[in-house]
């Protein structure tokens, strides 16, 4: 059902995973479980702000509590320039550009990169960045591929993967910002082809809806300060 609804090519996803494994071995990434444990020490028991790349992210004034951390989706990490010293994790497929991930890394954060059928051909062009990041990077794929340098985080957008990561690593409270999973619009934070409030592609809208279902399955500990109602979305 998911494959047909999103138009995913399973063969292409396997090829992307194979490429990701080669990249992981080439740059000598750390065991993703070891890096996850490091991130967990930052996230567990803390309030986590999950910052999506939706239109409302550009209109939100982020007031981040001391001692909390941010998990940002793709280009939404560029919003960190307006904040002070805050711990951040980037969850990205790099559609929003490489600069937001660089910003997170340069501030001492971690980068979780999703390599999939739409972006794997561009990965060889950023090998220098990946080598620099290798001690604080996790490579993830859409399908389970037997490779020690890879792992999986469920989700179809960087935003819902960011939420799943926060939940899995023991955040005490999750506050979403810019998680516009019911929207039919997107921004340049999500992909460079968009403006500040551009109509999203059909594929993007379907991914957002599936992301909403994933987060809905984790609703028991979902906390929002943005809007009332189911999921606060």
What kind of region is each of these model predictions?
Residues 47-54, 69-71:
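Short, hydrophobic/glycine-enriched beta-strand segments
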Residues 50-55, 158, 173-187:
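Glycine-rich anion-binding loop/nest that anchors nucleotide
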